[in-house]
């Protein structure tokens, strides 16, 4: 319903998450216009790129245990900020290092940090959407979130393809760095839902 969508679009705590998922997937797709060429430049044929991607992805999944531990300690805001900051740091490092033809170990480390950031943010944001959205508009909130995720995938591919033709890899990495920095600045004030630990005493006082 139109009213529920308005509640979602105008909600003071949801727009940062919606912006975030759009930026995350825009950066992901645009970045991947550049990364394969950097790996080839570093001496790794395209058919062997999985030798870098697979270990980086698997190692990043091992880091998710820290996310769940941090959530139990009520440190979810720190996890979210760390993920966004790490995403920005990776884009900035690629921007600075790409003209110098970074080696495979450097690229592998940057991809590991990227996947750590990506997995942290992918695991954190949908949970925050469902917990911060008004109960009557939770479905609409998740629908808007998923729509912006899809739009980010499209925008990243289109933007990356256009920029690499117009200005080369550096233009793509400037754009991804600016987007990640914008998200970091705007997302720094993201409100967190009350933790279960803090909610319990409040409920007890109510009785």
Regions from the language model: what does each represent?
Residues 162-180:
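A membrane-interface helix-boundary motif in multi-pass transporters
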Residues 176-207:
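Multi-pass alpha-helical transporter architecture, strongest
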Residues 46, 135-145:
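Loop-to-transmembrane helix entry/capping segments in MFS-fold secondary transporters
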Residues 78-125:
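C-terminal transmembrane helical hairpin of 12-TM major facilitator-type secondary transporters
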Residues 1-20, 204-207:
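Juxtamembrane intracellular "pre-TM" segments in multi-pass secondary transporters
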Residues 62-77, 164:
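Helix-to-loop junctions at the C-terminal end of transmembrane segments
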Residues 33-49:
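Short amphipathic helix-loop junctions that connect adjacent transmembrane helices
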Residues 11-31, 112:
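Pair of pore-lining "gating" transmembrane helices in MFS-fold secondary transporters
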